[in-house]
Amino acid sequence: MFNFFKKIVNKIKGEEAKEKKRQSVPKEELEEILIGFDIQYDLIESLLKHLGDLITPKQLEVALLRFVRGDSYYDKTRLKTITTKPLVHLIVGVNGAGKTTTIAKLAKLSLKQHKKALLGAGDTFRAAAVKQLQLWGEKLNIQVISAKEGSDPSSLAYNTIESAIAKNIDEVFIDTAGRLHNQTNLKNELSKIARTCSKVLKDAPFYKFLILDGTQGSSGLTQAKIFHETLALDGVIMTKLDGTSKGGAILSVLYELKLPILYLGMGEKEDDLIAFDEERFIEDLVDAVFVGQ
């Protein structure tokens, strides 16, 4: 699943790594490999500080589990269960992270569960974003609520949820703008949208998911923190993990934001969304580290 780890190890070693597994690796070499995965350095220090000079696969696995499962060091939150109908998902993230495509993927999952879905084109200042969501709606046969360019996105969110209530829709997915260059305005806009969602839902809970570009590495955390501070996010979906991603951002999100990673976007098709599996993630990372030379 996480082949990018093995690619990075091969690059660090300067040759195609053999499949034979090593029994241990020196701490300095392990540190170099983890840096190559684009895992932030303070996280690496925390992982390795209680380990010896030679580290076994089991020792690394246990250290990683402490971060992603919760230990005395940090408690990872789990996605809260919401039973409200319609179940509203407010989707946020910077432009280019893959919000619109991810919304289509989430809607496709909803359809597979025999649920009725509705989409809201809340990035009202970008005609291209609205058009893209409408095209996905046509492809998936899902209605898209939209408004004229430049309309108030909060009103769009309100109308989308009102329509969902009237039509007995199960799940709603609302797109949003992601103009971080105008950070203050964006934060105010997102806060207003969230308040509007709460109002029309009569204070019933709803999900706020961040779409994070996996190719950004640790630098994407700065963006993520802004959204989390603004909205108190419920979870993260990481995209573009089929390309140049180094994978380390996954650990960094768990470590820094203490938010669950829900799905991974592994391509551009509506089915290219897989549930994040912590055990498989750790297993693949450890396997890549201990590939023989």
Swiss-Prot record:
It is found in: Cell inner membrane; Cytoplasm. Keywords: Cell inner membrane, Cell membrane, Cytoplasm, GTP-binding, Hydrolase, Membrane, Nucleotide-binding, Receptor. It comes from the Bacteria. It catalyses: GTP + H2O = GDP + phosphate + H(+). The keyword RNA-binding does not apply. Transmembrane segments: none annotated. Its EC number is 3.6.5.4. CDD domains: FtsY. It is a peripheral membrane protein. InterPro entries: P-loop_NTPase, SR_rcpt_FtsY, SRP54_GTPase_dom, SRP54_N_sf. GO terms for cellular component: cytoplasm; plasma membrane. Involved in targeting and insertion of nascent membrane proteins into the cytoplasmic membrane. Acts as a receptor for the complex formed by the signal recognition particle (SRP) and the ribosome-nascent chain (RNC). Interaction with SRP-RNC leads to the transfer of the RNC complex to the Sec translocase for insertion into the membrane, the hydrolysis of GTP by both Ffh and FtsY, and the dissociation of the SRP-FtsY complex into the individual components. Part of the signal recognition particle protein translocation system, which is composed of SRP and FtsY. SRP is a ribonucleoprotein composed of Ffh and a 4.5S RNA molecule. Belongs to the GTP-binding SRP family. FtsY subfamily. HAMAP family: FtsY. This is Signal recognition particle receptor FtsY. The gene is ftsY.
